[in-house]
């Protein structure tokens, strides 16, 4: 294609949000295996290296993102331990930070050695903990970084050595005081000029609300409920802070009551409305979005970053125009316009129930009572009797979306079909198959009588539909990993992260 720009074209833009970041999280079933299979084949398994991050940073520049919280799960080598990672971040002018459980740019899961260093306990093991932080600060002198203050457990747990509310408050206050003194000394800078953020995530919010003094120059980053709904934003006093505020927002999640690590189906209107709300509360310094893989989260990630760059570019009441513009950008004017209707319907259907939640089950329950900590697959709340057969209507709506998507695909230029499969067909068809699998299995259980099930044609027909839908998910996933673009995306798609029921 020929690209051109008008003579004397000029544009002057500046971002609405200063730090626009991506957190590569829960990478175990997508980004990490893909990195090992493709971009970083020469590295050891678990080392997400400069090959992966170079490709990620190229995408981030296209999205106008400028900050990274690197992948940090157990089994993933720490970002700073892999040769070339820091250098490639510097070459793209990417600011490097770390998540709510990784203060001072430290990956505690893989870098803290309890056998050698003792407990990750600031109260009882302060000298060793401070040495651990100091080492990383010295390594990052001169680097463009955003330092996370505070302390939690090794990985997403409570701070050790404190039990009462008073101990938690005093302990965390001491941590912040120590960290700031360390940053000022080791970086040789006025501490008020060092970019810092404090993230009151889960139990830390209670400590903050009990009277924790977070210095005025530190940004406060508020969190959603892990499912896309912000639970706290800056009040009038906090809005006057020099350090400003920000948000940490999930487009994927691992944890109770249930993960969603397969597809990215958060409703675009919700993303838009929540980010507009954050902006209205002057939380404009730093926005970070949690994704298990940026390719899987392509549209919502683009929406999030477009708003971070220009908050006026998208309004909640007109978010469909943004979706249409994105579809046109990816697949051309005619196809993009035709896709708006089915994709809007798709997000409505997944808004009713995420595909990952169709088993009506929960995770991380008491293993004494639940095998693997998982509740069993249950009947859904979709009724085959009430509301004009709600169950069948839900399945029929999915079939209509599939028909409309299929019609667009038939007319698509061949060179666009791989991208179409990844961004449109796989999530639509796989979500539809999950709905069929769960709801037809439910129908079979309700129709069939236990003593005559194998002679009940209606029950057997529903059971076969359920089984075939499961096979369809397997087939689609195999195509994504092994045939799409000649195997370019091998290892990126896992239909059952954490081996949860699918």
What is each of the regions a protein language model found here?
Residues 46, 75, 119-126, 162-169, ...:
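Hydrophobic alpha-helical scaffolding
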Residues 1-123, 141, 197-200, 211-228, ...:
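Feature activates predominantly on carbohydrate-active enzymes
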Residues 323-501:
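C-terminal non-catalytic alpha-helical accessory regions
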């Amino acid at each position: 294609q020929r690209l051109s720009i008008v003579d004397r074209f000029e544009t002057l833009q500046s971002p609405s949000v200063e730090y626009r970041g991506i957190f590569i999280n829960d990478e175990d079933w997508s980004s990490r295996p893909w990195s090992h299979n493709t971009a970083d084949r020469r590295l050891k398994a678990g080392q997400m290296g400069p090959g992966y991050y170079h490709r990620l940073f190229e995408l981030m520049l296209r999205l106008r993102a400028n900050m990274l919280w690197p992948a940090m799960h157990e089994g993933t080598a720490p970002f700073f331990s892999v040769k070339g990672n820091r250098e490639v971040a510097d070459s793209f002018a990417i600011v490097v930070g770390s998540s709510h459980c990784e203060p001072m740019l430290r990956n505690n899961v893989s870098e803290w050695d309890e056998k050698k260093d003792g407990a990750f306990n600031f109260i009882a093991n302060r000298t060793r903990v401070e040495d651990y932080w100091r080492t990383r600060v010295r390594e990052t002198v001169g680097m463009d970084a955003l330092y996370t203050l505070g302390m939690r457990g090794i990985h997403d747990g409570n701070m050790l050595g404190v039990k009462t509310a008073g101990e938690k408050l005093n302990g965390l206050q001491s941590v912040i005081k120590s960290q700031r003194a360390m940053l000022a000394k080791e970086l040789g800078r006025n501490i008020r000029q060092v970019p810092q953020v404090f993230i009151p995530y889960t139990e830390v919010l209670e400590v903050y609300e009990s009277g924790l003094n977070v210095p005025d120059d530190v940004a406060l980053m508020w969190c959603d409920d892990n499912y896309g709904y912000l639970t706290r934003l800056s009040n009038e006093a906090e809005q006057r802070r020099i350090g400003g505020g920000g948000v940490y927002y999930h487009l994927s999640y691992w944890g109770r009551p249930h993960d969603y690590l397969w597809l990215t189906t958060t409703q675009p209107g919700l993303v838009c409305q929540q980010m507009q709300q954050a902006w209205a509360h002057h939380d404009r310094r730093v926005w970070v979005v949690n994704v298990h893989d940026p390719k899987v989260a392509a549209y919502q990630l683009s929406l999030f970053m477009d708003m971070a760059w220009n908050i006026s570019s998208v309004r909640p009441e007109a978010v469909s125009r943004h979706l249409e513009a994105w579809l046109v950008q990816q697949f051309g004017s005619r196809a993009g316009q035709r896709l708006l209707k089915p994709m809007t319907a798709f997000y409505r259907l997944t808004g009713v129930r995420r595909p990952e939640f169709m088993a009506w089950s929960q995770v991380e329950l008491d293993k004494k009572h639940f095998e693997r900590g998982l509740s069993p697959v249950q009947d859904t709340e979709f009724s085959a009797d009430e509301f004009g057969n709600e169950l069948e209507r839900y399945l029929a709506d999915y079939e209509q979306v599939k028909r409309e998507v299929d019609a667009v695909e038939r007319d698509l230029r061949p060179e666009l079909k791989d991208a179409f499969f990844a961004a449109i067909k796989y999530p639509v068809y796989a979500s539809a198959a999950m709905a069929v699998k769960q709801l037809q299995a439910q129908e079979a259980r309700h129709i069939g009588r236990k003593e005559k099930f194998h002679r009940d044609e209606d029950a057997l027909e529903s059971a076969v539909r359920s089984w075939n839908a499961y096979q369809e998910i397997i087939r689609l996933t195999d195509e994504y990993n092994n045939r799409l673009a000649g195997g370019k995306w091998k290892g990126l798609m896992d239909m059952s992260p954490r081996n949860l029921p699918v």
